[in-house]
């Protein structure tokens, strides 16, 4: 596979120092994105967990344990550029957001389970996203060496991510609880603004490096497809092993295969200066997991219709 264009070892010279204003803006965009996610969370989402704890745990296992471990093992086995491996690890460390709720609902899975899992995962991600990303990067010789080359300390990344996620999440949860009407009114505009701002920044970076993209897109898409399929498979295997009902299996499978690529892109922009290889992996994930998730949902709906007929 040809990764020359996106391998950070062969990337054209870049400015060594980030522009502080740009970094501040990107940090604020990421914080706004996390804040808007927190505005969606409701107390009822967490109360439902007490009614189906086994199903919630079943859905969390592939997200926070199996997919990160499988991703780390895959990066050790594959000879990929360190920045590509780092992107795979980061995506695996970012649990899915509200999009998985829609796909689960459309596929006639257990929507209540999906919503509750997303709520719990959003809080767990405050600690486990930086933790999982940190240990995977440190336990892979190639990515650990790459971090040293670009002068990034894994502990600094952990602390920075925890703060960037925890503070806006706490503020969003507080506003959602104390001022629910205001939270509902500003949630969509803030979410749309932060996502569009992030995508605009990423798009400008991709356009500037478009001459490097052609050779790398297909092999990187293949990596994303296989990575996503692994998440879906791990979700299915976990739910089957724990004897879940069919609607629960669908919810767990979707939660296992849909990751928060938007959060991953935000972290890449802020922490890794929008590294091209990492951006491509996370961007392709953002597209492909919708394709695979909706394909499954459509298949399930058609199968249910056939059984009903």
Regions found by a protein language model. Name each.
Residues 2-309:
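Alpha-helical transmembrane segments of multi-pass small-molecule/ion transporters
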């Amino acid at each position: 596979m040809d990764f020359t264009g996106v391998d950070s070892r062969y990337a054209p010279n870049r400015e060594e120092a980030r522009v502080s204003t740009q970094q501040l803006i990107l940090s604020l965009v990421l914080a706004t994105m996390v804040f808007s996610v927190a505005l969606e969370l409701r107390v009822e989402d967490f109360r439902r967990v007490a009614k189906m704890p086994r199903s919630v745990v079943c859905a969390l296992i592939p997200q926070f344990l199996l997919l990160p471990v499988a991703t780390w093992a895959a990066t050790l086995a594959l000879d990929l550029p360190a920045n590509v491996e780092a992107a795979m690890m980061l995506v695996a460390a970012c649990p899915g957001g509200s999009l998985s709720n829609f796909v689960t609902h459309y596929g006639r899975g257990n929507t209540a389970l999906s919503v509750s899992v997303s709520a719990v995962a959003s809080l767990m991600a405050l600690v486990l996203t930086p933790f999982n990303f940190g240990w995977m990067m440190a336990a892979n010789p190639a990515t650990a060496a790459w971090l040293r080359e670009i002068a990034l300390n894994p502990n600094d990344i952990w602390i920075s991510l925890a703060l960037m996620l925890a503070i806006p999440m706490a503020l969003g949860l507080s506003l959602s609880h104390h001022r629910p009407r205001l939270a509902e009114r500003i949630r969509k505009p803030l979410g749309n603004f932060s996502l569009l701002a992030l995508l605009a920044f990423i798009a400008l970076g991709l356009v500037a490096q478009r001459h490097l993209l052609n050779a790398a897109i297909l092999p990187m898409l293949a990596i994303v497809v296989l990575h996503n399929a692994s998440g879906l498979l791990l979700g299915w295997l976990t739910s089957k092993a724990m004897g879940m009902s069919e609607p629960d299996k669908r919810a767990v499978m979707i939660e296992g295969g849909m990751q928060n690529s938007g959060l991953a892109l935000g972290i890449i922009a802020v922490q890794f200066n929008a590294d091209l290889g990492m951006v491509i992996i996370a961007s392709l994930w953002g597209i492909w997991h919708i394709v695979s998730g909706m394909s499954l949902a459509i298949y399930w709906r058609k199968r249910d219709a056939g059984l009903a007929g």
